[in-house]
Amino acid sequence: MRVMGLDVGSKTVGVAISDPLGFTAQGVEIIKINEEAKEFGFDRLGELVKEYQVDKFVVGLPKNMNNTEGPRVEASKAYGDKIKEIFNLPVDYQDERLTTVQAERMLVEQADVSRDKRKKVIDKLAAQLILQNYLDRMF
């Protein structure tokens, strides 16, 4: 079962995919979107769904530290509802608190990546962490 993890932002969607057995997550790419212009990257997402033969989506939920839900959680859930409708695949949600912070720390401390380069990969790595956390919880 291949699971696709998504880190949904207002300008980008980080994409990760599980291995066929559902044990490990790998970052795939970052899809540029524009919420204000109603451009959500569904065409590119569809190409990736076909390429990787995806069976399920996991969308990160950026809850507040006190476990409350803000406007970004609503946007992520709306994105999840839309991909469920478009691709007719199940969608689960994973708490993503601190995954971007964790991703940034990994890039700085372990890989010594410059700020400009971090901006280009941070969402993909965050999607990978969201998906890996989900896989670890499920299996």
From Swiss-Prot:
Coiled-coil ranges from the UniProt annotation: none
Record Pfam families: RuvX (PF03652)
Keywords: Cytoplasm, Hydrolase, Nuclease, Ribosome biogenesis
GO molecular function: nuclease activity
Entry annotated with the keyword Mitochondrion: no
GO CC aspect terms: cytosol
GO BP terms, alphabetized: rRNA 5'-end processing
First-level EC class: hydrolase
Record carries keyword Glycoprotein: no
Cell location: Cytoplasm
SMART domains reported in the protein's UniProt record: YqgFc
EC number: 3.1.-.-
PANTHER family: POLYNUCLEOTIDYL TRANSFERASE, RIBONUCLEASE H-LIKE SUPERFAMILY PROTEIN (PTHR33317:SF4)
Protein purpose: Could be a nuclease involved in processing of the 5'-end of pre-16S rRNA.
Family: Belongs to the YqgF nuclease family.
Protein name: Putative pre-16S rRNA nuclease
Biological classification of the source: Bacteria, Bacillati, Bacillota, Bacilli, Lactobacillales
